[in-house]
Amino acid sequence: MRIIKYLTILVISVVILTSCQSSSSQESTKSGEFRIVPTTVALTMTLDKLDLPIVGKPTSYKTLPNRYKDVPEIGQPMEPNVEAVKKLKPTHVLSVSTIKDEMQPFYKQLNMKGYFYDFDSLKGMQKSITQLGDQFNRKAQAKELNDHLNSVKQKIENKAAKQKKHPKVLILMGVPGSYLVATDKSYIGDLVKIAGGENVIKVKDRQYISSNTENLLNINPDIILRLPHGMPEEVKKMFQKEFKQNDIWKHFKAVKNNHVYDLEEVPFGITANVDADKAMTQLYDLFYKDKK
């Protein structure tokens, strides 16, 4: 009987201790004691808007929020340094769904759960903002940010709907040495649609496709957008050289009418970001600058 009584007391004690530890852990989480490491610039900028501290940040030539200036770098978004991240003792390491497959080995080495967010479109990013707000106790900030983006989007869509003619747009996404054509499934394609442009590329199952200038000439867009990704100045020079040396471009209506525009990585980009309000506004102004 004494043994049974002793075991009963021991079990109760363990349950109480475990309960207390669980409660303490929940309180810690509720108080916002997260150690967050975003692995992409877009996520870093979003966390700043949600007023969240971070313990690690991606290595980037882009300017990150000043509040994170003393935060340690953890490497490139596609190749974060496992040991550098481990040293930070993170509770959450964040990435985007676009590179989920590529990031799985990284999370396996960390022995941590991967958190992936959709930044492929404005709608996807807004859903991710809500998820981040719920996850890190920033619901009010997430709602405020999404309300602002919705307001700008609605305003742009309403103005575009009143236009009698919508420009046909070709979007070129350049990297050093080459370029691809963006479809509606890409983030920039999504923005073009919101701003009242019609993407001349109708592919539905891919974000980007390889280019064929002869086929593009047959489509003959009203506007050509050139978006750099990585080393923007080098990519701009590449585009200028391509359009100057490849004789076929001079036959494009957009080139003849000087409707070829180089977009900046900020506020644009290949993934959605919190500067989407500025990007939508700039695109609308480009498309309808003669209609004001």
Curated annotation (Swiss-Prot):
<feature type="lipid moiety-binding region" description="N-palmitoyl cysteine">
    <location>
        <position position="20"/>
    </location>
</feature>
<feature type="binding site">
    <location>
        <position position="41"/>
    </location>
    <ligand>
        <name>heme</name>
    </ligand>
</feature>
<keyword id="KW-0564">Palmitate</keyword>
<dbReference type="GO" id="GO:0005886">
    <property type="term" value="C:plasma membrane"/>
</dbReference>
<feature type="binding site">
    <location>
        <position position="60"/>
    </location>
    <ligand>
        <name>heme</name>
    </ligand>
</feature>
<dbReference type="GO" id="GO:0015886">
    <property type="term" value="P:heme transport"/>
</dbReference>
<feature type="domain" description="Fe/B12 periplasmic-binding">
    <location>
        <begin position="35"/>
        <end position="291"/>
    </location>
</feature>
<keyword id="KW-0408">Iron</keyword>
<dbReference type="InterPro" id="IPR019957">
    <property type="entry name" value="ABC_transptr_haem-bd_IsdE"/>
</dbReference>
<keyword id="KW-0472">Membrane</keyword>
<dbReference type="InterPro" id="IPR002491">
    <property type="entry name" value="ABC_transptr_periplasmic_BD"/>
</dbReference>
<keyword id="KW-0479">Metal-binding</keyword>
<protein>
    <recommendedName>
        <fullName>High-affinity heme uptake system protein IsdE</fullName>
    </recommendedName>
</protein>
<comment type="similarity">
    <text>Belongs to the bacterial solute-binding protein 8 family.</text>
</comment>
<keyword id="KW-0732">Signal</keyword>
<keyword id="KW-0349">Heme</keyword>
<keyword id="KW-0449">Lipoprotein</keyword>
<comment type="function">
    <text>Involved in heme (porphyrin) scavenging. Binds Fe(2+) and Fe(3+) heme but the largest fraction is Fe(2+) heme. Functions as a high-affinity heme binding protein and probably has a role in relaying heme-iron from cell wall-anchored isd proteins receptors to the probable permease IsdF.</text>
</comment>
<dbReference type="GO" id="GO:0071281">
    <property type="term" value="P:cellular response to iron ion"/>
</dbReference>
<feature type="lipid moiety-binding region" description="S-diacylglycerol cysteine">
    <location>
        <position position="20"/>
    </location>
</feature>
<feature type="binding site" description="axial binding residue">
    <location>
        <position position="78"/>
    </location>
    <ligand>
        <name>heme</name>
    </ligand>
</feature>
<dbReference type="InterPro" id="IPR050902">
    <property type="entry name" value="ABC_Transporter_SBP"/>
</dbReference>
<keyword id="KW-0813">Transport</keyword>
<dbReference type="GO" id="GO:0020037">
    <property type="term" value="F:heme binding"/>
</dbReference>
<feature type="binding site">
    <location>
        <position position="61"/>
    </location>
    <ligand>
        <name>heme</name>
    </ligand>
</feature>
<feature type="signal peptide">
    <location>
        <begin position="1"/>
        <end position="19"/>
    </location>
</feature>
<dbReference type="GO" id="GO:0046872">
    <property type="term" value="F:metal ion binding"/>
</dbReference>
<keyword id="KW-1003">Cell membrane</keyword>
<dbReference type="Pfam" id="PF01497">
    <property type="entry name" value="Peripla_BP_2"/>
</dbReference>
<feature type="binding site" description="axial binding residue">
    <location>
        <position position="229"/>
    </location>
    <ligand>
        <name>heme</name>
    </ligand>
</feature>
<feature type="binding site">
    <location>
        <position position="42"/>
    </location>
    <ligand>
        <name>heme</name>
    </ligand>
</feature>
